[in-house]
Amino acid sequence: MSENSKVKFTTNKGVFVAEIFEDKAPNTAKNFLDLVNKGFYDGIIFHRVIDGFMIQGGDPTGTGMGDPGYKIKDEFGEGLKHDDEGVLSMANAGPNTGGSQFFITLAPTPWLDGHHAIFG
């Protein structure tokens, strides 16, 4: 089996790298990596930052309302939990409404399990 991809995030607060779980959330990972490779996320801000909870980005409008023009189905990989800081998940407005927006947890957030697809 091939190794999972890694994506580098460059922000005004520094640089970090995320492993993308192509092995555990293949459809969600493919969607995210396709957007990365198309340059969709280039220059997009983290429009929502909640200390002790999460940072959210991936909206081309910067308002929290933007998307790539389509929605993807939720994908909940076996064993994936919001049990630590640094979990990368799809943001959504309800079931099967993810697209491009994502968030990274700053603490364990178990109430999000089964509601937001983890892919990194």
Language model regions located:
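Cyclophilin-like peptidyl-prolyl cis-trans isomerases
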Residues: 1-119
